[in-house]
Amino acid sequence: MWITQEITPYLRKEYTIEAKLLDVRSEHNILEIFKSKDFGEIAMLNRQLLFKNFLHIESELLAHMGGCTKKELKEVLIVDGFDLELAHQLFKYDTHIDFVQADEKILDSFISFFPHFHEVKNNKNFTHAKQLLDLDIKKYDLILCLQEPDIHKIDGLKRMLKEDGVFISVAKHPLLEHVSMQNALKNLGDFFAVAMPFVAPLRILSNKGYIYASFKTHPLKDLMAPKIEALTSVRYYNEDIHRAAFALPKNLQEVFKDNIKS
């Protein structure tokens, strides 16, 4: 048996699996979890793959990309995703997390897949809301959007950021789909003074890129090395990974030169 990961519309990977462990369907999402000899458990959420053995890569990168470029991280908003491991990493800071996800059926089905599921859900500083309107009106230090946002969502979310707040969103991989990344950079650049693409260095099982955006905070100039050194129980993230995440090959520097704002 095998499952197929769509990297781009024209590129696919296949992974051998031993068994299907779970199949859950809701109105808007389909979650399947498989057992794999080489990769442990693999979750397929709407045709996108999550590898249980490597969940820490994205969660550490995104959490500390924001946390280590901000002096304080008091209020965090996570939208359009299910990754509770991201919240687990963010709790290394003295922060409150608002987690917006309407699909409780699918979220609760990750109970055995996310190692810190119960720890996060039971944390007194974690608030799960079905929609943004359910939350108190406030300004955030960090907003993480786990799906590529359109301009209307960007416009709405940026109004919820503090003046020195950071907005991090998922995008297409700059090497695999550079036109999509260009468009995403342009959309964010229309609202922010800083808009820079990055990837997860040495992560070979992903087709994701990301964008760091802010009104004034810079992901490299404002990086605080002492905060990185103070982090405990991290397996992936360090200062070298942080800086390397923003490195682009010569050809992509040329492609994105009119879209990157730094």
Curated annotation (Swiss-Prot):
It comes from the Bacteria. Pathway: Amine and polyamine biosynthesis; spermidine biosynthesis; spermidine from putrescine: step 1/1. Its EC number is 2.5.1.16. Keywords: Cytoplasm, Polyamine biosynthesis, Spermidine biosynthesis, Transferase. GO terms for molecular function: spermidine synthase activity. GO terms for biological process: spermidine biosynthetic process. It is found in: Cytoplasm. It is an enzyme of class 2 (transferase). The active site is at D155 (proton acceptor). It catalyses: S-adenosyl 3-(methylsulfanyl)propylamine + putrescine = S-methyl-5'-thioadenosine + spermidine + H(+). SUPFAM superfamilies: S-adenosyl-L-methionine-dependent methyltransferases. PROSITE patterns: PABS_2. InterPro entries: PABS (IPR030374), SAM-dependent_MTases_sf (IPR029063), Spermi_synthase (IPR001045), Spermidine_synt_N (IPR035246), Spermidine_synt_N_sf (IPR037163). S-methyl-5'-thioadenosine binds at N29. Belongs to the spermidine/spermine synthase family. Catalyzes the irreversible transfer of a propylamine group from the amino donor S-adenosylmethioninamine (decarboxy-AdoMet) to putrescine (1,4-diaminobutane) to yield spermidine. Homodimer or homotetramer. This is Polyamine aminopropyltransferase. The gene is speE.
